[in-house]
């Protein structure tokens, strides 16, 4: 009997990279002319980003700068869920953004559906916040990786532990 191969599908955000992107964003808004004299700031509190600025327009500009820096640092921007804009102290506005870690049940079911629709002889099982895919043929597993990458999922996924 041939040995089965497997890999895990996960969704992770590297927090040191997020911190680096925040530092680069703060450095850029400190030197930009349109942010001179404004109270714009980005902080990381546990698994949540907090963006503060003078008004909604500057907050959206801050978000654009942050997104660009996150993309340069290979942090998936699909895994950021922005909350609503709220008023903060001192006439500023604040927006919280949750960094999504792991694959929830709904997204795991979507990934399983993509795997089942491929028609390949592989098994997939949901394990907490990841999906494990096993099969006898490594080529089938590589086709599954291509199918999941090509699927339009609401979160960004990574593939680890390919054995």
From Swiss-Prot:
Disulfide bond entries: none
GO CC terms in record: cytosol
Keyword vocabulary terms for this entry: Nucleotide-binding
Transmembrane helix recorded as keyword: no
Annotated InterPro entries: DUF520, UPF0234-like_C, UPF0234_N, YajQ-like_sf
Record's signal peptide: none
Keyword Mitochondrion belongs to the record: no
UniProt GO MF annotations: nucleotide binding
Lineage top rank: taxon: Bacteria
Function: Nucleotide-binding protein.
Protein family: Belongs to the YajQ family.
HAMAP family, alphabetized: YajQ
Protein name (record): Nucleotide-binding protein RBAM_011030
Organism: Bacillus velezensis (strain DSM 23117 / BGSC 10A6 / LMG 26770 / FZB42)
């Amino acid at each position: 009997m041939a040995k089965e191969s497997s890999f895990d599908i996960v969704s992770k955000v590297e927090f040191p990279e997020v911190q680096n992107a925040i530092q680069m964003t703060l450095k850029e808004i400190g030197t930009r002319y349109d942010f001179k004299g404004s109270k714009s700031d980005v902080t990381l509190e546990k698994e949540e980003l907090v963006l503060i600025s003078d008004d909604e327009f500057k907050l959206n500009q801050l978000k654009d700068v942050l997104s660009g820096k996150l993309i340069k640092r290979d942090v998936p921007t699909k895994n950021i869920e922005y909350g609503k804009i709220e008023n903060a102290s001192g006439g500023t506005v604040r927006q919280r953004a949750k960094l999504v870690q792991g694959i929830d049940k709904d997204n795991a079911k979507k990934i399983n559906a993509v795997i089942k629709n491929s028609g390949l002889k592989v098994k997939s099982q949901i394990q907490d916040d990841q999906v494990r895919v096993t099969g006898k043929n490594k080529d089938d597993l590589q086709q599954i990786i291509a199918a999941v990458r090509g699927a339009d999922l609401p979160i960004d996924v990574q593939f680890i532990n390919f054995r």
